[in-house]
Amino acid sequence: MQIFVKTLTGKTITLEVEPSDTIENVKAKIQDKEGIPPDQQRLIFAGKQLEDGRTLSDYNIQKESTLHLVLRMRGGMQIFVKTLTGKTITLEVEPSDTIENVKAKIQDKEGIPPDQQRLIFAGKQLEDGRTLSDYNIQKESTLHLVLRLRGGMQIFVKTLTGKTITLEVEPSDTIENVKAKIQDKEGIPPDQQRLIFAGKQLEDGRTLSDYNIQKESTLHLVLRLRGGMQIFVKTLTGKTITLEVEPSDTIENVKAKIQDKEGIPPDQQRLIFAGKQLEDGRTLSDYNIQKESTLHLVLRLRGGC
């Protein structure tokens, strides 16, 4: 069959191929026609970079399909992938490679299917559609490879309009990961999402298992009012912390934000406003705490009551 290869200069090359040809074969044909070495070629189809060892039929490339040829920047780089067994894999990548591409390279080297791979960098699980540069992964960075437990689970997310979204997740997924999955499905930016479970707002850095969210649990999605506000928290040392909050945030949420900023565990925090100690389950609006209000933070004595 014939396929077309379009270059960034707008030139279109016609190739005679078979569905069983590998991407490597196709690059060799391009080299024969155009003189471009295969290791400088990147072929893109349907927005996806094609891996050498796969075939045209693997990517559902049919007659008269058009591939896009991008010249590989001579700024390819090496990164390392460390497995839980302690083995380190070296990969040749580019900043523009997607996480999906990286998983395909790992599959080529190690035989682990991409859907069983979870890649972690700087404590964050990497999402397939993002690129290495999105996560600021640079040359000689080390990613961590965790095998996905078979036993991923479904959860439901219910919106205020009554729509229910089904998500495939794992207990170890962070709330941040879940918001990214909702963005992929619904297009809602994570910073506009608030997720509620068992009456509690879920914090980005925590995992589903931290909140005991199990298979077929239902979370509630509330869109963040673009009326978030700033408040101040003053410590006994005189330091003032600025927090982004909403009137509907609970005192517990505020303590979690303080922990994220200052590292002080919530159970050691006492928050005072207008001479009154604030209770975890109440909200800022319950106490009439408004924008630019100042709370006072007192550290709870260990063993105090």
Curated annotation (Swiss-Prot):
Keyword Methyltransferase listed: no
One GO CC term, this protein: nucleus
Keyword vocabulary terms for this entry: ADP-ribosylation, Cytoplasm, Isopeptide bond, Membrane, Mitochondrion, Mitochondrion outer membrane, Nucleus, Phosphoprotein, Repeat, Ubl conjugation
Cysteine pairs bridged by disulfides in the record: none
Modified residues annotated as Phosphoserine in this record: 65, 141
Short name of any one Pfam family annotated for the protein: ubiquitin
Residues the record marks as site: Essential for function: 68
Further remark: Ubiquitin is encoded by 4 different genes. Uba52 and Rps27a genes code for a single copy of ubiquitin fused to the ribosomal proteins eL40 and eS31, respectively. UBB and UBC genes code for a polyubiquitin precursor with exact head to tail repeats, the number of repeats differ between species and strains.
Protein name listed in UniProt: Polyubiquitin-B
Organism whose genome encodes this protein: Ovis aries (Sheep)
Chain's gene name: UBB
